[in-house]
Amino acid sequence: MKLDASLGTEGEYLKGMDKTARAAEDLGFAGLWTSETKHDAFLPLAIAANASHQIELGTSVAIAFSRSPMETAQTSWDLQDLSAGRFVLGLGTQVKAHITRRFSMPWDRPAARLREYILALRAIWGSFQTEGPLEFEGEFYRHTLMTPFFNPGPIEHPEIPLYIAGVNTRLAELAGELCEGFHVHPFHSPEYVRRTVIPAIAEGARQANRDLDQVTLATSAFVITGENRERATEQRESVRAQISFYASTPTYFTVLEAHGWEDVGERLSTMAREKKWREMPAIITDEMLAAFAIEAAPDEIGPALRERYEGLIDRVALYLPFVPDENDEFWQTVVESVN
């Protein structure tokens, strides 16, 4: 199991991205992932690629439908070339409200649209590598023009691993059919991964005559830890609040269903609509907390991760942002406990 680092998005993180990439690589992390919330997911990786040599660099979630496949293809191509083959493209759909109201882009049949988006990416990359014509015509996307002036040309590592980030079974099936990896949402349990995610990926792989082991499973894990009891208690309540937020969202009710906790989701959803944010964490019991998070001392996090994910997850990051010069001793201890 690989241990990765997740990049935070607070403060002036972009200005220190070169230092962050070197620090993550020096500590022994296998990969460094960006997400797309307050900032662009790709730009930090260009800086990281120039500052590092071995660590894998990827977008855990870059929003697909806010961009044309051509735009994503070009950016990914350049990052793959710049990093000498270390780039991993992770895509997500987001939800309808954000795509239509924040990005002002179309939304319909997201799984079918994402499937075609992936096929379009690979057609574009094929045109880049062969310097041949581009002929992709689908239901949602049409790319039929590529002249030498606009073609970046072949690169040394043209095979770009593509992951999908998702929660429900349709996207997991799509990953099994077409992709090299699937990012399991941080709000999960081993039981949910075992009973819902893996069978869906296996079904998608079966339909495409692929093997399940061709698909890497990655995730971020909620972790309750600390150098003392006070810090651990503080983190426990923080994780409890985060879980209550995710559990209130209907999109994630399938995770609760794996444990027979559907009523908890409905109750939290009602409280969220009533803006009872401060009262919501109390609904998450210690049993639920144990299902969705691990609790361990820093030097025991590695064994706890292996016990939880062995045979289920191939690579994992902690649901904590990695920032150099902040908690360096903690991160060194965690990496050593895993490796």
Q: Predicted regions: what is each one?
A:
Residues 1-339:
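Active-site-adjacent structural elements that line small-molecule/cofactor binding pockets in enzymes
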